[in-house]
Design a protein with these regions (language model features):
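Conserved G/P- and acidic residue-centered "switch" motifs that form tight phosphate/ATP-binding loops
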Residues: 23, 79
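Rhodanese-like catalytic fold shared by cysteine-dependent sulfurtransferases
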Residues: 1-19, 27-71, 82-130
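Short, surface-exposed ligand- or partner-binding patches at beta-edge/loop junctions that are enriched
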Residues: 75
């Protein structure tokens, strides 16, 4: 799995129009916090269980993808869930997996707020909100 900084990920998407851009956050996070245009939501885990099912996740991504060699870009809140999700996809046979380091919102700052230090939104990249 390749690690891409948000600006690199955006440029990578522009260079790979055939890529599948997957938001692995819970659907409610994606809708209310915001998400990049064109991303599809396939949660790594969902409320109330909050327990990932790697096989189910990989199966859903496989249904959305054109094949296991399709380029994939994964995004979550801060770049942690995508590490586990990406490993699960590689274990399931996906061969071209990237993830956005720092995710959509990035790390917490000294005041426990996100999107102020790093992340897709902090970098001023395109996003939308419900």
């Amino acid at each position: 799995m390749k690690n891409l900084q948000p600006q690199e990920a955006y440029a990578w998407l522009q260079a790979h129009p055939d890529a599948l851009f997957v938001d692995v956050r819970m659907e409610i996070e994606s809708l209310y916090v915001g998400r990049p245009p064109g991303v599809i939501n396939v949660p790594w885990y969902e409320y109330p269980d909050l327990q990932p099912d790697a096989v189910k996740f990989a199966d859903i991504v496989a249904q959305e993808a054109t094949g296991k060699d399709q380029p994939l870009l994964l995004m979550c809140r801060s770049g942690q869930r995508t590490l586990a999700a990406g490993k699960a996809l590689e274990a399931a046979g996906f061969t071209d997996v990237q993830h956005v380091v720092h995710g959509f919102e990035g790390e917490l700052d000294d005041h426990f707020k996100r999107s102020t230090v790093s992340g897709w939104r902090f970098e001023g990249l395109p996003w939308e909100q419900m």
